[in-house]
Amino acid sequence: MSELSTLARPYAEAVFRMAQDENDLAGWSSRVTTLATIVSDTQVARLIADPAVPADRVAELIVSVAGDGLGERGANFVKVLSANDRLTLLPEISTQFETLKAGAEGTLEATITSAQELSQAQVDDLVAGLKAKFQRAVNVQVAVDPELIGGAVIMIGDQVIDGSVKGRLQRMAFALQG
């Protein structure tokens, strides 16, 4: 995964700079997300992986599926990725673009994974705490993982706040082995 991240980073940064230059972060966010969705389709993925299909033909197909909203620069971006055999990086490019966009907008992306479904009030309380701690707006995604036993794990940026029972048990086991 880190290799994908490393390969995708220059493309994500280039698109981000272009979006900033055009003052169109939201538009480029939509374009990159659309492209990531297209290349994630199983039929398109098979086409991308097929060495018998020329790269320029794959690029044309993706541009066609994406539609007019892609624009000339978006189409050129697809062609560059295709020519360099990097179309499969689009989901990671999209993820990194969104992270850069959130940073530029002063927001953080967080994932809250809890052992049980959280009420909206609980989510709101956690978001308020994160906003206070990080002094930035926070966009959250909530997930449930019963294996946590109890509590929650919050991933925000490259930080992990593990308040789960499973995490506590693992730390105790490690300390006892110690």
Swiss-Prot record:
GO cellular component, one term: plasma membrane
Name of one Pfam family that matches: OSCP
Membrane-protein topology: Peripheral membrane protein
Keywords recorded for this protein, A-Z: ATP synthesis, Cell inner membrane, Cell membrane, CF(1), Hydrogen ion transport, Ion transport, Membrane, Transport
PANTHER family listed in its UniProt record: ATP SYNTHASE DELTA CHAIN
The protein's assembly and partners: F-type ATPases have 2 components, F(1) - the catalytic core - and F(0) - the membrane proton channel. F(1) has five subunits: alpha(3), beta(3), gamma(1), delta(1), epsilon(1). F(0) has three main subunits: a(1), b(2) and c(10-14). The alpha and beta chains form an alternating ring which encloses part of the gamma chain. F(1) is attached to F(0) by a central stalk formed by the gamma and epsilon chains, while a peripheral stalk is formed by the delta and b chains.
Protein name, per record: ATP synthase subunit delta
Organism: Thiobacillus denitrificans (strain ATCC 25259 / T1)
